[in-house]
C-alpha cells in the first residue's frame, strides 16, 4: 500500500505540476537532519476526493517529509533579472500544498523573470516555532544555500525574498524575525539568512491571544519590506492575523502594504476566480517594482 501511495503521488505531481522547468534539487541537509526524524513512512499525498479540486484544477499535497529539500526553477535566461524568492507552501505544518502554493507560484515568478526556490520543509511536526524549531532551521538553511549558490544560479544575493502561504506565511514571518537563530544541532554559519522582502499570503498564527501580534513575531526595524493579502471571510486563518501584523510592522516603521478583500476564503493560491482577490498577483508585481526588487535597482536593505 505504501509503494502504491508513493506511485500515486508521483503520477499526480507529473500531471498537476506546470511546465516550468526545474533546474536543480538539493537536500537541505546533505547528511542527517539536525534532529532525529519523527516522520513514519514514505512521502504520500493525503488529499481526499473531497478536497482534491480547487478552482477547477487538481491540487497535490505532500506529507511525511523527512528529507527536506529545495527545488530551483529558473526563468528564461533572456528574462532573468536576478531577483529570486523562496516559496513556503502552506498546510498547517501537517502537509504541503505543493502545486497550488508551490510549483504554480514558481511558474508565476518565472514569468516575472525571477528565480523560484521551492522549499519542501519537514512536515508533519509537533507544533511550530517557538515550540518547534525544525521549520525555522529548514527555512534558514534554504536561504543560506540559495545565497551560497547565487552566482551559479544567476541570482542577485541582495534581492532574495520569501513568499509564504498560510502556515508557510507564518514560516516566512518567523524567518524574517529570527534569521540569526542558532539551533543547538546546527553548525554556525556566516551566510546571512535574512530575506530582502517578504510576501505574506493568508497567514495563520501571527496573532496572539491578546489580540496583538504573537510575542515571538514582534517586528523590529530589521524586518524587510512586507506585502500582505487576506480575505475577510477567511475562516481558516482569520483576517486578524494580517491586521495585527500590519499594525506591528507600522509601529516598527517597516515598509508594508496590506490588501484585504471581502471574499476569497482560504487556500486559493494564484488560481483565477471571478473574485477581485484573484488580482493579488498583479498587485504584488507592482509592489515588487515599488521596492525595486523588479526594475531599476533601489534602496533595498542589504544583509
Residue spans of the language-model regions?
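N-terminal cap/lid segment of alpha/beta-hydrolase-fold proteins
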Residues: 22-79
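Short beta-strand element of the alpha/beta-hydrolase
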Residues: 81-90
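Catalytic nucleophile-loop/oxyanion-hole region of alpha/beta-hydrolase
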Residues: 96-98, 122-154, 273-278
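Short amphipathic alpha-helix adjacent to the substrate-entry channel of hydrolases
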Residues: 99-117
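Primarily recognizes the serine-hydrolase "nucleophile elbow" in alpha/beta-hydrolase
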Residues: 137-221
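Short beta-strand/loop motif that positions the catalytic acidic residue
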Residues: 222, 228-230, 234
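Conserved alpha/beta-hydrolase "acid-adjacent" motif
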Residues: 236-241
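C-terminal catalytic histidine-bearing segment of alpha/beta-hydrolase fold enzymes
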Residues: 243-246, 250-303
Amino acid at each position: 500500500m505504501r509503494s502504491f501511495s508513493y506511485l500515486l503521488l508521483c503520477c499526480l505531481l507529473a500531471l498537476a505540476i506546470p511546465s516550468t522547468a526545474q533546474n536543480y534539487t538539493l537536500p537541505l541537509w546533505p547528511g542527517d537532519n539536525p534532529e532525529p526524524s519523527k516522520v513514519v513512512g514514505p512521502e504520500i499525498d493525503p488529499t481526499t476526493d473531497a478536497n482534491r479540486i480547487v478552482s477547477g484544477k487538481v491540487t497535490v499535497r505532500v506529507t511525511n517529509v523527512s528529507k527536506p529539500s529545495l527545488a530551483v526553477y529558473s526563468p528564461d535566461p533572456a528574462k532573468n533579472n536576478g531577483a529570486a524568492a523562496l516559496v513556503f507552501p502552506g498546510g498547517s505544518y501537517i502537509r504541503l500544498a505543493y502545486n497550488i502554493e508551490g510549483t504554480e507560484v514558481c511558474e508565476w515568478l518565472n514569468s516575472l523573470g525571477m528565480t523560484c526556490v521551492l522549499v519542501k520543509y519537514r512536515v508533519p511536526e509537533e507544533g511550530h516555532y517557538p515550540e518547534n524549531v525544525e521549520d525555522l532551521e529548514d527555512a534558514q538553511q534554504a536561504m543560506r544555500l540559495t545565497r551560497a549558490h547565487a552566482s551559479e544560479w544567476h541570482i542577485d544575493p541582495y534581492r532574495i525574498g520569501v513568499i509564504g502561504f498560510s502556515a508557510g506565511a507564518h514560516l516566512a514571518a518567523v524567518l524574517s524575525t529570527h534569521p540569526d537563530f542558532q539551533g543547538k544541532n546546527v553548525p554556525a554559519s556566516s551566510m546571512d539568512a535574512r530575506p530582502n522582502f517578504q510576501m505574506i499570503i493568508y497567514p495563520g498564527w501571527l496573532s496572539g491571544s491578546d489580540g496583538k501580534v504573537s510575542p515571538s513575531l514582534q517586528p523590529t526595524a530589521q524586518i524587510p519590506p512586507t506585502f500582505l493579502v487576506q480575505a475577510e471571510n477567511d475562516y481558516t486563518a482569520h483576517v486578524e492575523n494580517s491586521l495585527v501584523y500590519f499594525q506591528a510592522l507600522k509601529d516598527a516603521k517597516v515598509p508594508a502594504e496590506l490588501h484585504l478583500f471581502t471574499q476569497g476564503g482560504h487556500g486559493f493560491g494564484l488560481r483565477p476566480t471571478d473574485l477581485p482577490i484573484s488580482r493579488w498577483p498583479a498587485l504584488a508585481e507592482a509592489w515588487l517594482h515599488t521596492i525595486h526588487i523588479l526594475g531599476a535597482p533601489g534602496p533595498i536593505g542589504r544583509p
